[in-house]
């Protein structure tokens, strides 16, 4: 529900049905998201899951170069901006482009709709803000957290989230425990898992 209120396409797919002539027709898996029409009114739209990614379907496959399609396939993000129609506002402008993994659809975010931060976790971005504005991923190192840890990572604009996202390269969320189901794990196996 939080994604819908923020104007994003939710990641959770649900079975969708529609009543036609008194019968329920199965639409498959999909999600619901708010979209602004040409008049500026907000409407709820149904997004069903596509069998193949939207960038491989006409007319979008003609819009992207082979290199851009390869980048969308591997990373899920274009890595640059593209002049195209924004799906939420309906206007043609420079947009950040990402692939919504759950529905296989393209999501766009107009460049002028996002105010980029000058600091990430208290670390000044500096001249890299222009690279971030152009859609590239930037590396930020030596970020000092309040608990004393020092982390480094990559920041980029994510059209799915509608914001700048930071990926911690140190990955503090991955913890290798000493035991699994009560069985002690050797130091060699712990090193291989890390």
Which residues are covered by each model-predicted region?
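Gram-negative host-targeted secretion-system effectors, predominantly Type III and Type IV
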Residues: 1-194
